[in-house]
Structures are given as structure tokens and as C-alpha cells.
Regions:
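Short amphipathic alpha-helical segments
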Residues: 10, 77, 157-158
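Asp-based phosphoryl-transfer active-site loop
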Residues: 2-18, 93
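Active-site phosphate-binding/coordination module
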Residues: 23-129
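Structured loop/turn residues at beta-strand edges in well-structured enzyme cores
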Residues: 1, 57-59, 157
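Short secondary-structure boundary/capping elements
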Residues: 20-24, 143
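An N-terminal domain-start capping segment
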Residues: 13-21, 127-130
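Short, intrinsically disordered, charge-balanced linker/junction segments flanking boundaries
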Residues: 145-158
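Acidic, His- and aromatic-enriched active-site or binding-groove loops in soluble protein domains
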Residues: 121-148
Length: 158
């Protein structure tokens, strides 16, 4: 059977502990790509982080991020598919999370919007791509409705 595409999840599949990719995985991905098979990184993470790891393994195709809510060509503005959550629904989700004491991350292409300063620090460590400025991730901490409205307005098209 000849495959045209291989989709690889990141967390718990491609990435080992400490966010590393084994040499064996890199070698296998290169061999598959050299046979003309598209290698696509797929993840629940935001686009910039997925694209960063896609580069690390040498995948030159599209990236599927945010649990399928974003499909985008790397290093371009070409978005193949994007499904945003309505602004009012985001507000309701944030309000419910705050009332229940739940840490929340809302994603744009390159930004995490969170309701927790602790989560902010953890996310900076987990999603660090500081060695590649093309894939930097911003983190906005939102602690009240006014700030949430400001942030949602900034990212309304993202």
C-alpha cells in the first residue's frame, strides 16, 4: 500500500519527555518524506508551536493545530481552514472557568490567553520556542472581563 500522507501527533507520540524528538523518529520521518509522502504535524497545541516542531523534523507541509481548528501552510499567511469560537462564547467560557476555579487556555495562531499567572509561567516553559523567532508565542493573562474584552478585540480575526 502506498501512503500519500502521514499525520503525526506531538504530545505522547512524536515528543518524548522534555519536549525532545528522538533521532530515530527524525530519521524515520526523513525516510518517509524522501519517498514523497507528506508528513503533517497534528496537535491540540497552537499553530506556532506545532509549526516549530514541524520544522525540527524537517516536515515542509501544512500544519494541523488546535485540535483541527487551524490548518495552515508554514511560514505564510495561507490559512487552509480556521474555525474560531464566537467572542460571546469565549466570555462565557472564561466566566465559568473563573467561577469554578479552572485554569483556562484560549488559543489564537500565536497567543495563549489564560486566566492564571501560574499557568502563564508554565506555558512559557512548555511552549518555549525562543530559539526560533518565526514561531514565538505570546501569553496574555486575563483576570477580569474588561481585560478579556480588550484581548478578544485584538485577536478577533485570529
Amino acid at each position: 500500500m502506498n501512503y500519500k500522507m502521514v499525520c503525526i501527533d506531538m504530545d505522547g507520540t512524536l515528543l518524548k519527555k522534555r519536549k525532545s524528538i528522538s533521532d530515530e523518529s527524525k530519521k524515520t520521518i526523513k525516510e518517509v518524506a524522501d519517498k514523497g509522502v507528506k508528513v503533517v504535524i497534528t496537535t491540540g497545541r497552537l499553530y506556532n508551536n506545532a509549526a516549530y516542531y514541524s520544522d525540527l523534523v524537517g516536515a515542509s507541509t501544512e500544519v494541523i493545530a488546535a485540535n483541527g481548528a487551524v490548518i495552515r501552510t508554514k511560514r505564510s499567511d495561507k490559512v487552509i481552514f480556521k474555525k474560531n469560537i464566537d467572542k460571546d462564547i469565549c466570555k462565557k467560557i472564561m466566566q465559568a472557568a473563573n467561577e469554578c476555579g479552572v485554569v483556562l487556555h484560549l488559543h489564537t495562531m500565536d497567543t495563549i490567553i489564560t486566566n492564571s499567572y501560574i499557568s502563564n509561567a508554565i506555558a512559557r516553559a512548555v511552549f518555549s520556542t525562543k530559539d526560533n523567532k518565526d514561531f514565538l508565542i505570546d501569553i496574555k493573562t486575563v483576570k477580569n472581563e474588561k481585560k478579556l474584552n480588550e484581548v478578544l478585540e485584538i485577536y478577533k480575526d485570529d
